[in-house]
Amino acid sequence: MKSSLLVYALFLVITFLFYSSAGTAGTLLNVSYDPTRELYQEVNTAFAKFWKEKTGQEVTIQASHGGSGKQARAVIDGLDADVVTLALAYDINAISEKSGLLPKNWQKQFPDNSTPYTSTIVFLVRKGNPKHIRDWDDLVKDGISIITPNPKTSGGARWNYLAAWGFALKKYGSEGKAREFVSKLYRNVPVLDVGARGSTITFVQRNIGDVLIAWENEALLSLKELGKEKVEIVVPSVSILAEPPVAVVDKIAERHGTTKIAKAYLEFLYTAEGQEIAARNFYRPRLPDVAAKYAGQFPKVALFTIDEVFGGWQKTQAGHFSDGGVFDEIYKGIR
């Protein structure tokens, strides 16, 4: 009798575990950068529906947002991210190098160097553009108040800095002149927020500053929410191609048993549906058909890449943004 009861109890446990695993794929944590909240709210809902229809399993996707550099540090320090979707490749490189949680060749996991969408850097100004800001040169004039986040913590801020440096390098022809230009720009910055969304709040809600140097997607979102009666977008003559990458954090996903779902989640970003969601949230899609559909949404701008002008992220981070680097020297000299 006892043996029969034991067999029956074991049968119930196995049955429960079978149906539990068939009904849920568990929980994913996406550690992302600051202004992607709206994007991933929509992606997460769409992917959960897609996965349920495909597998019958329910999945819960949680998200953490903040300055890209801070988010990378949090993962290195123990935040259990199944996937990371950060502002720039260096931050994921740092996770790989300092924690060993994903391989050094992580950018080979997905197409386009694991960058499913792109963006660039533009200016957001107040209605009527009262300070007549047209290009980067206008930002270094006396009396201009610029809002941009801190490059030590924010990925978007690093793109802002590099866009300004690249403009000056192309126009004035030397690293010395570019450094002088960027120094003048930061003299006009009254406050450095931790992340890009914080800077948007400073400019839009706290009404500080004449111009916000911003992710294109963040500027377009602000224009959509506030309307032309509040803000306008100014597209500079030249800017940088910003490529925010994605990666599965392999060792954490393996430990959680979420590797399959984590990979599928990031692959979803490359599908027609995922690309449509990116475009609706003002990120430039990679898929040609979707890019053509939304071409009118994105202004034409001459773009350079970090590899072309700066030699890639490893060199750029070490020279400009590491402790004691060029940014620290510039900021120390003006404060």
Predicted regions, residues:
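Sec/Tat signal peptide C-region and signal peptidase I cleavage site
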Residues: 19-25
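Bacterial N-terminal signal peptides
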Residues: 8-19
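Positively charged n-region of N-terminal signal peptides that target proteins for export
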Residues: 1-7
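Extracellular/periplasmic juxtamembrane helices and adjacent flexible linkers that interface
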Residues: 253-335
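N-terminal segment of the mature folded domain
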Residues: 25-153, 302, 331
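Short beta-strand->loop
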Residues: 31-33, 125-127, 145-171, 185-189, ...
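Ligand-binding pocket segment of bilobal, Venus flytrap-like solute-binding proteins
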Residues: 171-237
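Short helix-loop capping/hinge motifs at secondary-structure junctions, enriched
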Residues: 128-134, 153, 166-174, 252-260
